[in-house]
Amino acid sequence: MRQGLVPKKVFFTSGVGRHREMLESFEMALRDAGIEKFNLVTVSSILPPDCEIVQKSEGLPSLYPGEIVFTVMSRNSSNEPSRRIAASIGCAIPKDPVKNFGYLSEHHSYGETEQYAGMYAEKLAENMLFTWTKEKPGKTMNISKTAEVDDEGNWTTVISAAVFIL
């Protein structure tokens, strides 16, 4: 059976960046998350079967600067003073994660707390898994980042990401 590019590991990270330019605020968020050195390719929301969730500190050394790296990423930016922005990734892990795939969800919003945005993303992933399997997940989790735009209206970007390791 052909498996192609199926990730063996995944780690979660998030970051915030601020700059007068929108693109540079995104770069600063990538740096804060520790994933600025890679050519990131966003993919949709499947957590492969038998994909081990590892800590960022374990996953990052497995990647090489300039490497093409697949990620599920949530991103939000604003330059509206005092605007709160959020970016979250939810994860629903099936009861048998060795045999079955799970779901990852992206949620980006305005005005929500980090906790609320994270729980919302987690619930999205749980619902996506349930509509496919008709079973509740074995475990759910999320990673979120929120920030408030400064009074000067500098661009602020938040990201949350599930980063795959092949």
From Swiss-Prot:
Catalytic activity entry: L-arginine + H(+) = agmatine + CO2
Cited Gene3D superfamilies: 3.30.60.30, Pyruvoyl-Dependent Histidine Decarboxylase, subunit B
Site, as annotated: Cleavage (non-hydrolytic): S44, S45
GO molecular function: arginine decarboxylase activity
UniProt EC number: 4.1.1.19
Cofactor note text: Binds 1 pyruvoyl group covalently per subunit.
The UniProt record lists the keyword Lyase: yes
Record key words, sorted: Decarboxylase, Lyase, Pyruvate
Gene Ontology annotations of biological process type: arginine catabolic process
Pfam families in alphabetical order: PvlArgDC
InterPro entries: Pyr-dep_his/arg-deCO2ase, Pyr-dep_his/arg-deCO2ase_sand, Pyruvoyl-dep_arg_deCO2ase
Disulfide bonds: none
Modified residues (Pyruvic acid (Ser)): S45
Domain of life where this protein originates: Archaea
Enzyme class at the top of the EC tree: lyase
Cofactor section: pyruvate
PANTHER family named in the record: PYRUVOYL-DEPENDENT ARGININE DECARBOXYLASE
The family this protein is said to belong to: Belongs to the PdaD family.
Protein's recorded name: Pyruvoyl-dependent arginine decarboxylase
The species this protein was found in: Methanocella arvoryzae (strain DSM 22066 / NBRC 105507 / MRE50)
Lineage per the UniProt record: Archaea, Methanobacteriati, Methanobacteriota, Stenosarchaea group, Methanomicrobia
